[in-house]
Amino acid sequence: MKRIFLLVFFISSCAFAQEHALVYFTDKPNAVEALETPANLFSERAYERKLLRGTTIDFLDVPVHEPFISDLKARSGFEIKAKSKWFNCVYVIGERNSIEILESLDHVANVQFLEELSNRSQSIPLKINENKLETEIDFNYASTSNQVRMLNLQNLHEQNLTGNGMIIAVMDSGFPNVNSLVSFENLRNNDNLLGGYDFTNRSEDYSASTLDNHGTLVLSTMAAFRENLYVGTAPDAAYYLFVTEVSATETPVEEAYWVEAAERADSLGVDIINTSLGYT
């Protein structure tokens, strides 16, 4: 009886196993029409940036055809977690049989399954290097002196190159309390916190206290400023903050969130993407 129970349990577990897959579409039926008015595909800054740099605006810049997505949403057995205009696909999680059937649709080019990564993140002890450098600087960086001088950024700061006019997109696991921490008061008061989005929860609240704080820490190395106490490496830059990482689970879908955030950053005309994340 015990063996029968274990067998039934195993079969049931397999039947309801959640598979990860990319569903690629055949085309973008609205591409020609969309490219007739390319300025509508980007922010004004992004469009002007592409023109200035001679960047080609093409099929990749056109969003995924919405009727294709709506058709998939109407079906059962899986959930759409992310989409990508650059790859013309959606990322789905669900029952394998339900996902495999999609390949028979006229507007689906192919389906690619991914092996789910189950390893959870491990805590690594933080070792702070307090090496003292001989270079003398005029600014009072206080606790950030070592990191600024290690990168030799004091020379840029002395030329007033502190990020002014630049837009940086930070993609990470969360930015709790950036809207209230005193260290980011300068960022907020100068209207340099341009906004953001939590792609993992489909939420505008990228600074929720329930999110992992790694993004807040990363942002602080660049944007935080307290006179005579702390100076980030680019305190006068403007920032978009995007949540793409789920620290508790570490599954492939996070890479799809990352692509979505990169596409959003490109459409907003950011100058730099900072992503202190790694995937294997």
How should these model regions be labeled?
Residues M1-V23:
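Bacterial Sec-dependent N-terminal signal peptides
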Residues Q18-R49, F87, L105:
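Extracellular pro-sequences of secreted precursors
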Residues V23-D27, K83, G94-E95, L114, ...:
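Active-site-proximal beta-strand/loop segments in catalytic clefts of secreted hydrolases
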Residues P29-A31, F87-N88, N97-S98, L117-N119, ...:
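Solvent-exposed loop/turn segments at secondary-structure junctions
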Residues L35, Q154-E254, L268-D271:
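Subtilisin-like serine protease catalytic core
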Residues T37-R75:
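Aromatic- and Gly/Pro-rich amphipathic surface segment
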Residues P67-V148, Q154-H157:
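Autoinhibitory propeptides
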Residues A262-T280:
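Short acidic, glycine-rich surface-loop motifs adjacent to enzyme active sites
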